[in-house]
Every structure is written in structure tokens, then in C-alpha cells.
Amino acid sequence: MIKITLKDGSVREYNEGITIKEVAESISAGLARVALAGEVNGEVKDLSYPLENDCTLNLLTFDDEGGRDAYRHTTSHILAQAVKRLYPDAKLAIGPAIENGFYYDFDVEKPFSVEDLEKIEEEMKKIIKEDYKLERFTLPREEAIKFMEERNEPYKVELIRDLPEGETISFYKQGDFVDLCAGPHIESTGKVKAFKLMSVAGAYWRGNEKNKMLQRIYGTSFTKKSDLDAYITRIEEAKKRDHRKLGRELDLFDIYEEGPGFPFFMPKGMVLRNVLEEYWREEHRKAGYQEIKTPIILNEELWHRSGHWDHYKENMYFTKIDEADFAIKPMNCPGGMLVYKRKLHSYRDLPQRLAELGLVHRHELSGVLHGLMRVRCFTQDDAHIFMTPDQIESEILGVISLIDDFYKVFGFKYHVELSTRPENSMGSDEDWERATNALKNALEKKGIDYKINEGDGAFYGPKIDFHLEDSIGRTWQCGTIQLDFQMPERFDLTYIGPDGEKHRPVMIHRVVFGSIERFIAILTEHYAGAFPVWLSPVQVKILPILEKQHDYVAEVKKALEEKGVRVEADLRNEKIGYKIREAQLEKVPYMLVIGDKEMENRTVAVRSRKDGDLGPMRLEDFVNRIVEAIKNKEN
């Protein structure tokens, strides 16, 4: 008999060799119906997987990431089978589950059209109806290569050849279709209830632009049609909110062919950006940070010393000055190290919090560039906190509070992930354990739930990532807290302790916005361009009905400007309805309509973007109202 510990902590005994599906059936018929896979000792397996030893078992449904991934991975195999039926000469590449769906890459003679996707969807429906069982089998390396060569699948052969010696080479079969795959998968094709092919795009084999361009079909799938419909509605809403479209329409920012990945900010976009940066500076001053500015170009030797050369060289730009090699900074950290190192520090000076809005450049492939979300140059709101070991927890708690305050102002909810040591890391096991435990303790002291991302930390230390949830339910990773014992070592940073001896400080890297450009893109989509009044580039638009009201308009404008309100007057000889419609399209928070009555009574007729017609209001009352809304950063 073996002992199986379930998610609720209960322990059950079963015969050796019982499958995950049979365990689910022994618990309840309802659970067996919705179970898609099982997590055995932390590893996701098919329901047919036999349990031979004592283990922990978590039965996964579509509500669990592992269950969703298995379900969508199977849908990608159904897609591949449909494509092979319709286009027998198509060569298969890869087809994983991804966040919100799946994709499969194909090598085909001509790109897929929208009509092709419709045909493929119909074929997929047939395969689902045929309800093929997914069966896993393995082959020795040479047999696996021969098997895929006989099927004329060169990409699969390449993948097999690249697998380490001794690696288990597994395949999944459904009907007459077979694919190289590590799994896991759900039981049968008939279990897929609702799916949609979303789009097609070009993708280089293995992400390398020197390789052949393949056709990537994206799709998604759900266990309920209602959930699929809701997702498609969200996607349509996201298209309307696309920051690239709104950035142009609202005259905020754009990207031109002459500078792919290098954003241009227009006057209104600069207003928005400056408001964000001023808020950032104000809050950091209150939290005891000092602002610094470090150069964009620094000697190549510095990047060897920092470790970026070994871990980040492929993403860097280089230049020569006076025959010496220089690099354009991809990160602000090394500059911050030099600022700290410039003089001797006492333990009484610590913690020292150095903050920087630093412009960085990173080489990104043209295929992944996306508006302000993925660019080649951006401003990162970095800070580096240097401290004694006994200050670690209090400083992490302070950063968490600061980040929490920032996100609340914008109305964001968030979840937190703790990322641990990656393979290509620097430093000792002891340092990594100490750093990881410090982050865990701070989160637990704050009462914040968190998920662990094994192996996803930075190369110099573990990190906490903050994932914002926007108004249509999408998540965006923005804030980061990274604890680093390595960089102070590499730069030989010290402070004088109470014993009069030199000691090594500990350092936190952290960002709140992350990339300012990306944060602006997120805000633009979150608010659909209708920014709260404190962020709006134009907060008030004055709309006179006739030219004779222009003198009073100037008076109203001056009264608002004297209080720091950003205001424009539309003095064009156009009908008032047209002016109102245009101001609405510009998403201005307040419109003040001025006619003869308003001029005589020293009032303004107020229209709110949010609440519509608010009626007449004394000018002084409106000024007080909007000043209060701006001061309180009302959303």
C-alpha cells in the first residue's frame, strides 16, 4: 500500500499503481468529472499516471494553472492534427500552452488566411467530436529520431537531437496523429468544450531571426462556452483600449519608422509623463530617498565588473570613445554602485536610499516590439537601498508600503510573486537562502499572500514581483523588489560598523512603475484614455457659444490657471454641439459651456465626462471643486 497526501492535508492509502484518475473517482464522481490532471510532488502529470510510491497529490481542474495548461496544450495538439489533415505537407514545430491560451508554429508554403483559420476550426470540431484518447509512449533516442524522420518532421528531429543524453523522449498519440511532447495532457479530445482560433502571425523558429519564419496560430480554449464568450468580449474591449491607437488619437505618444522601439512623446503626453514623475519624486522625498542621475554611456569594464557582461551582453548596445570600448547602459545599477562608493560611509549613515529616473537602452528583436509596452529605450524608476543586515526586513517592509500606496492611487489591485534562484546565478547558497527568507518574512509580516516562482529570480538575487490587475482583468508585472548580496561584493562596497571595522552592506534594487513608458501604456489602457482629472493632460475645456463671450472665457481661464489647473479654450467659430463632441472624444474630464446667461451671472455650465450635465455653478465653486479633486487624486 502507498500513502497519498491530498491538498487538504488528509492522507489516504491505496494499492501501488493506482492512477490519478482512479484516486479522483475514489473521492467523488463530481471531482473525477472535472479533474484534468494531477500535481504529484509538485510535478503536473496526466490523469493516467500510475502512483507507485508515497506522494502528495493535488487534483487539478480548469481553475488551477496546471489544469488549464494541460487542457490548452491538448487543444494545441487538436489544432496541429487539424492542420495536418487539411495541409499534409505542413511541418510541425512547437505548440505550448501560454497565458490565456495556446499557439502552434507551422512551416507552410503560404501564410494562413482568416478563411484558412475558419476551415481549421471546423476540422478541430470534428476531431473533438471523434473523441480520441491521448496516449503517451516513449522511444529510445535513435528510434525517436528515425520515427520523426519517417514522418518528415525536421523540426521535431532537431528538437530530439538537442535533448540531453538519457532524457526520456515521449510522444502523444490521438487517432492517427502523433506529436513529440513531454505533456501533460487531458484524457481525450472530446473533453475540450469551447475553443477559438484568435489570430495568426509570423514567428522565427526558436525565436532567432536568422532562422526560417514560421506561421504561428494563436488560440484559446475554456471548459464553458460562456467563459470563452466573456474572454472574447474582453479581447474586443482590449482592442478598443489599445494604447497605440489611443496614443495617436489623444496626441500623447507615437513611434515612427525612423526609430523602431524608440518612443516619441507629444506635448500632451509629456504633461502626463511629468505629472507621474512629479508624483514619484514627491512620494520618494517623503519616504527618505535622495535622487541621483547617472550617465547613459559608461566604460565597458564597468559592465564586466557588475556581471551584466556575462548575463546581459546580447541585450546591450556598444560604442567607442577615444578608442576605448563603452556600453549604453541597459540597467541603472552599476551607476548607483559608483555613487555609493564615492565616499566612506558609517553604519549611522545607513540605510541610504538612492533613487533614479534613469534612461536605459536594451536591444529587443523587432518582432517583439509593441508600442510603449516593449521598446528599446525607456526610463526605469530605479532605487538602490544600501543597508546593514539587521535593516533588511524593515527596509523591505518600507518598500512594500511605498509600492502599495502608489498602486492604490491609480485604483489597481495586485498580486505578489516571489521568484527564487535561477540557474545562471551569482553567489553562494547561503546568501541566496538568507535573501529569499528575508523577502518571505517581510511578505508574511505584511500579511500578503504570494506565489513562488521557482528559478525566476534575477541573476544576482531573489525578487518580489507585483502584478497589477487592470480594469478589464488583465495582469501586468510592474513593481519589483530584488535583494542583492552580490553587487556590493563585486564593487567592494563597505561601511564602517560600530566596531570601527569595514563591513559589506546589503542592497535592495527596486522599481515601482518599472518602465515609465510601459506604465503610461498600462494606465492608458486601464482608463481607456479617460485619465482621472489629476492625470489628464487637459483638465478643463472652456466652450463659448459666441465670440462675444470670449472676454469672460479669458477671465474663467485665468482663474483656473492661477490655481494650477490645466485648461484650454475652444474659441473656434463652430456650433456648441460640435465643440462638446470633440471635447468628449478628447476625453477631457470637465467642459465649461459659456453663453450669455453664464456671462451675466458670473457662472459656468458644467459638463462632466463621468456624470454628464451638472448644470450651472458659480465660477468660484467650480474652481474649488476641481482643485480639491486634483489634490485628492480622485479616480
UniProtKB/Swiss-Prot annotation:
CDD domains: TGS_ThrRS, ThrRS_anticodon, ThrRS_core. It is found in: Cytoplasm. Residues 242-532 are annotated as: Catalytic. One of its GO terms (cellular component) is cytoplasm. Zn(2+) binds at residues 333, 384, 509. Keywords: Aminoacyl-tRNA synthetase, ATP-binding, Cytoplasm, Ligase, Metal-binding, Nucleotide-binding, Protein biosynthesis, RNA-binding, tRNA-binding, Zinc. InterPro entries: aa-tRNA-synt_IIb (IPR002314), aa-tRNA-synth_II (IPR006195), aa-tRNA-synth_II/BPL/LPL (IPR045864), Anticodon-bd (IPR004154), Anticodon-bd_dom_sf (IPR036621), Beta-grasp_dom_sf (IPR012675), TGS (IPR004095), TGS-like (IPR012676). GO terms for biological process: threonyl-tRNA aminoacylation. GO terms for molecular function: ATP binding; catalytic activity, acting on a protein; metal ion binding; threonine-tRNA ligase activity; transferase activity; tRNA binding. Residues 1-61 form the TGS domain. HAMAP family: Thr_tRNA_synth. Catalyzes the attachment of threonine to tRNA(Thr) in a two-step reaction: L-threonine is first activated by ATP to form Thr-AMP and then transferred to the acceptor end of tRNA(Thr). Also edits incorrectly charged L-seryl-tRNA(Thr). Belongs to the class-II aminoacyl-tRNA synthetase family. This is Threonine--tRNA ligase. It comes from Acetivibrio thermocellus (strain ATCC 27405 / DSM 1237 / JCM 9322 / NBRC 103400 / NCIMB 10682 / NRRL B-4536 / VPI 7372). The gene is thrS.
